Amino acid sequence: MTLNGGGSGAGGSRGGGQERERRRGSTPWGPAPPLHRRSMPVDERDLQAALTPGALTAAAAGTGTQGPRLDWPEDSEDSLSSGGSDSDESVYKVLLLGAPGVGKSALARIFGGVEDGPEAEAAGHTYDRSIVVDGEEASLMVYDIWEQDGGRWLPGHCMAMGDAYVIVYSVTDKGSFEKASELRVQLRRARQTDDVPIILVGNKSDLVRSREVSVDEGRACAVVFDCKFIETSAALHHNVQALFEGVVRQIRLRRDSKEANARRQAGTRRRESLGKKAKRFLGRIVARNSRKMAFRAKSKSCHDLSVL
C-alpha cells in the first residue's frame, strides 16, 4: 500500500491560552481568494468533546479571520458558507502522527492552503476543506496537533478521535521510520475493534542523496502492519493531493455500502487496459498457490488507495 512528502513547525499561544488555528481551504492549488481561518482552543476538554457525537461543531466554533491560501484541484469546493455549519457526520477527522521534523506540518499546510508568511511557521493547527473525490464531495478536517504540549492526555485522545490516521516518517531519517512502526503498534492497541484507515507516509522523497529508508522497506512495513503506503515530497508537492484523496477513498471503502463503492470504482476500471486486467487476474491466481507470491501481491496493492 503506497503513497509519497515535507517539514514541521512549532506551536504558539494567544491571549494567555494555548490555541490551535483552524483554517479552511478550497479551489485549486496556487494563488486564490482568501482562506477562512478559525482559532480553536486546544485543551483536554475540546478533544474529549470531539469524541462524542455532535460535539465537533461546538469544538470548532471560533473567531473568523483571513489568510493566504494555495490552490486545490479545480473540482474542490468550499462547503462552509456564511451562516452554514459542519456536522460530525459530514466531516472526516484525519490525525497526522509521527516524529518531530518529518514534515507533518508541511503536509497539513499544503492541504490547508497556507505555506507562506509567519502563520506558516506555527504548528498545532487544524485545517479543513471540502474536496471532490470520484465525483462526490467530502469534507476533511486535518489535525496537526501531535507535537503540542498537552500533557499525557493528548496522545491518547489523538489516537481515539480519528476517522483516519496518517503516520509520517522522513525517508532521510531511519529513526523516524522506526518511530512510525511504534506508532502503528500503539494505534492497533488503542483501536483494536475499529477498522480505521492507516496510511504510512514516507516524506521528503526529493532528498535522494540523503535517503536512509528505501521504498521497499516502507512498502514491507505497510504490508506487515496492514496499512497503506505512499511516499511524498512536501517540498515539491509530490503526491500530497493523492495522499488526501486516498484518505477519503479509504474511509469510504470502510463506511459506505458495497453498492456505492462498486459504483465509484466502475469508472476507474473502465479506464484500465485489458492487459492490466489480465495481469491482475493472473497475479491473483498465482498468489493463491504461494505465500511468498501472496506477500508480493499484497505489497504491490498497498500503494493503491482506491482499494482495501
Swiss-Prot record:
Induction: Down-regulated in failing hearts.
CDD domains documented for this protein: RGK
Chain positions found as Omega-N-methylarginine: 24
UniProt GO BP: small GTPase-mediated signal transduction
SUPFAM superfamilies linked to this entry: P-loop containing nucleoside triphosphate hydrolases (SSF52540)
Subcellular location: Cell membrane
Protein name in the entry: GTP-binding protein RAD
